Amino acid sequence: MDIKQALKKLVASIDLSTEEMISVMRIVMTGGATPAQIGGFLVALRMKGETLDEITGAAMVMRELATPVNIDVDYLVDTCGTGGDGANLFNLSTASAFVVAAAGGRVAKHGNRSVSSSTGSADVLEAAGIKLDITAEQVARCVKEIGVGFMFAPSHHSAMKHAIGPRRELGMRTIFNMLGPLTNPANVKRQVIGVFNGELCKPMAEVLGRLGSEHVMVVHAKDGLDEISLATETQVAELKGGEIREYIIKPEDFGMQSKSLIGLSVSNAEDSLLLIRDALGNRRGQYAEKAADIIALNAGAAIYVSGVAGSLSDGVEMARDAIGSSLAGEKIRELAAFTQYLQ
């Protein structure tokens, strides 16, 4: 199937099969489509609504074309959101990664610069002095020696260069927001993934099951966050042992009070980093305690999924301990120093 045939089907609201999606994505990712065709394809796919088969096929192609990172460690996990929730919260999944590492987990963090929000994970890490342009082998060293390593998406998904222009010009979430968490170059089998729509929780878990994941939590909060929220209930689809369980969690389940998200939005990477450092440090700012609580909820989920904690409640408690001891904040400085040392 060529991209023109795919566009005709999508405009007519006809779903593509996994095989058809694989064919079209190979064209897109190998330079066989024009920017106009790529933009039209992404918009038509979004307007129709992406199906399980379409997401799976696209993820398979991106994995096939990725530059892999080989990391042989226990308790390896990724924390990643799809973005596109419009909340412009500080980089919560990035902050959570350092807490997980401080609690004994290992994080192979996959991310990029901002596309649809005020700041992406790469932006805030760069602001912290963490070197992004490192090899796959150096990423593996970071994970093994510091407990957390960052895989800058353009370095591992070079085929994405063909879609970068159309994505930026569209300025809205597309299927590529979903593909980021599904295409971790370290082939991580354990993940906490936030999605921009609650209807995606179970399908994303199902796609990851098809792709070989072992333990995954896919989350979406009722206030629209692609994270576990401190303000309201959060919908969860948990893949474990080949089965998917759906349930609802809320801050009170973990001994926390629900709090509004006022003060947790940022306009740039520097503001995001300041709030993260305050939350993981002395917590002197007006919103630092609130930020620390929401980080603990999300990091706790990753600690649980990694296998370090036996339950979600235990994971949240371990996250709070790691934050309170300032070990998590120290991990940011350790990773910055280590990456600058790498040659």
Curated annotation (Swiss-Prot):
Anthranilate 2 binds at R167. Gene3D superfamilies: Nucleoside phosphorylase/phosphoribosyltransferase catalytic domain, Transferase, Pyrimidine Nucleoside Phosphorylase, Chain C. One of its GO terms (molecular function) is anthranilate phosphoribosyltransferase activity. Pfam families: Glycos_trans_3N, Glycos_transf_3. 5-phospho-alpha-D-ribose 1-diphosphate binds at residues 81, 84-85, 91-94, 109-117, 121. Keywords: Amino-acid biosynthesis, Aromatic amino acid biosynthesis, Glycosyltransferase, Magnesium, Metal-binding, Transferase, Tryptophan biosynthesis. This is Anthranilate phosphoribosyltransferase. Its cofactor is Mg(2+). Pathway: Amino-acid biosynthesis; L-tryptophan biosynthesis; L-tryptophan from chorismate: step 2/5.
